[in-house]
Amino acid sequence: MRVTTRIAGFAREQREGIRFCALFALFTAVAFAVLYAGQNVVVVPLNRHLAWMTEQVLRLVGVHASSAGGVVSLGGFAVEIRNNCNAIYEVGLYTAAVWAYPASWRERLAGTVVGAGVLYAVNFLRILTLLTLGLLHRSWFEAAHLYAWQAVFLLVVGTCWIAWVSRIRPVA
């Protein structure tokens, strides 16, 4: 059997998976290109808004905090909310996976809205816990920020997508 015949047979057998991967790659590239191009219009204002929201929540629970631009200060400890701190790229990745999967546009829209909400809520919790950790145990901040929360957040993204797929395509 010739190699090209085997490849063609494999492609026919795996058509849906190949289609998903191709669409996922395309949608991911488009999402990241749009976010990169809209840096000053979307990303920077989102960072400022997250800093302000963080300040407001901390003040509600009686913690003296302040924010300026994308920086949140809390009792001598400050962090700057930057591109990878705002969940927008993770939401872009999740959205690309949802829209690449074969489902109705209503299922995709609902999955996008609910999933994005979950991811932004988890990210907000991430920001609050990292601020608290930085204030109480500054030496642990870098490891928690760069390793622990990055891994946890990617697991949350994957879990959200798997939960959505399981909801629209229950396993028999």
What residues fall within each predicted segment?
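Hydrophobic N-terminal alpha-helices or hydrophobic patches in metabolic proteins across all domains
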Residues: M1-A172
